[in-house]
Amino acid sequence: MPLYFSAHTTACLTKQALRELMKGLLTATDMKVRRCVASQLGGRMLTEVEAPNQPTLEKWFIARRINCEWIMRLDLDGKDGTVTEY
């Protein structure tokens, strides 16, 4: 399954609201959200999501009323001295 990073604006959300938003994404059953990171001060959230394609992922975020700044499909992932191709 293709892997995507996405960036979102979260301005004015409290830490509690951000936490609830992230929990909701991570426990979703219709899309596999691998990871969420957020900065309350920066007003931004990043997600790492497995999705069949970008249009489906865009519609998924729209259905949840989550603003997307950008979505990027990942081709290469480097960690622990190894590069993996998707």
What are the language-model segments listed below?
Residues 29, 64-67:
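Short, structured coil segments at secondary-structure junctions
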